[in-house]
Amino acid sequence: MEGAGPVLSILGLLLVSAPFGVLGERPSADLGAHPERGSQVSPGTTEPRRQPPPKDQRERARAGSLSLGALYTAAVVAFVLFKCLQGPDEAAVLREEKNKKKSSQSEQQLVQLTQQLAQTEQHLNHLMTQLDPLFEQVTTLVGTQRELLDTKLKTIHHLLQDCQPGTGVEVPEPEASIPFTEDLGKEDQEAGNSQAWEEPITWSPETRNLAPSWEVEQGLRRRWHKTVTKGPAVNGEQPLKV
């Protein structure tokens, strides 16, 4: 009913103008019936006064004009009603066309989206085919590194078990070390001057500078031999043979 407003306005104008067009001034019956009379009147003479038409003629003319006006208005009303009824149909048709256009556009968009999705799937498959060998290489490298780490850990564990004391492994006793000159000097200080030298050496300021180094070395060796031979005898062991 969008076009009903202007149609109704047009209908009102037609209804108002129809009676004026139908009921307008009509020529008199006398002039229509006797046209010669007007031509016979001389210009100098005065025109005689028109006589009013009889009552029957006026009623007939009025009835004819009313019938024509009624027919005209009926035709206009019928036309307007037809247009008003046809208007909603046209609006519905236009809406259907718009809906069809929208549906066709949506279908085209769906088709384009499906094509784009198919292209992206193809690209992804291509990338996966390129990345598969890389993944395999990485997995193999990881496996080899893990195996190496496992073997290293196992070897470390075995070594720790072997090195632990009290597991049945005999630990070798430390051998008797040869005493140094410093240790011998400390023992002499602790033992005191009770022990006598086999060949005591008397030192003096004059002979200290003259004594050669080999004599000092021989004296130290004798002292060390004496301490070594006395040590095991005190503990009840056999003396070491040098």
From Swiss-Prot:
Residues that span the membrane, as ranges: 65-85
Region of interest called Disordered, as start-end residue ranges on this chain: 27-62, 186-210
Signal peptide residue numbers: 1-24
Its membrane topology: Single-pass membrane protein
Provenance organism: Mus musculus
UniProt KW keywords: Coiled coil, Membrane, Signal, Transmembrane, Transmembrane helix
Record's GO cellular component terms: membrane
Location in or out of the cell: Membrane
Basic and acidic residues composition-biased segments: 47-62
Coiled coil start-end: 97-132
Protein name in the entry: Coiled-coil domain-containing protein 107
Chief location: membrane
Membrane as UniProt keyword: yes
